[in-house]
Amino acid sequence: MTPDPPIRLRRYAPPDEAPTIELWRRSWQQTYPSIDFSARVAWWQERWRQELLASATVTVAEGAEGIVGFVTVDTATGYLDQIVVAPESWGRGIAEALLAEARRQSPRGLDLHVNIDNHRAIRFYQKHGFCTVGDELNPISGRPVHRMSWRP
């Protein structure tokens, strides 16, 4: 599936911080409406700066309306921490484009955790060749998660 209107993938740059953090909030709020993600923005911003930017390659998807998605991949370990797409852009092929970029960056394989009740994400990953390899609890949220893995 190709996104339309066209998007451009590019490396994250420091001026992208505010729009990517807001995109994270909006996307997760849509996925879990009963959780107040506005109250978690400061935590996410700290994690973004201290953990993800320090260890991951971040690629943003940009359309005419601005940043519409991003993916974070630790290329040393193949860990995919986040694929986030603007809710109004779901179904446009942006997640597929970001996943293809993640695979290009980590050709030996990708590993991730996904909330067990995030059925939309689980279907997406399964459709794209990921298998569940275990279950555990997220150490921060305490939510049950699947460990999923993709190998070429």
Regions found by a protein language model. Give the residues of each.
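Acetyl-CoA-dependent GNAT
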Residues: 11-88, 99-101, 105
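Conserved active-site alpha-helix within GNAT-family acetyltransferase domains
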Residues: 92, 96-97, 117-134, 140-144
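Short hydrophobic/aromatic beta-strand or adjacent loop that forms the aromatic wall/cage
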Residues: 56, 143-148
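Conserved GNAT acetyl-CoA-binding A-motif
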Residues: 105-117
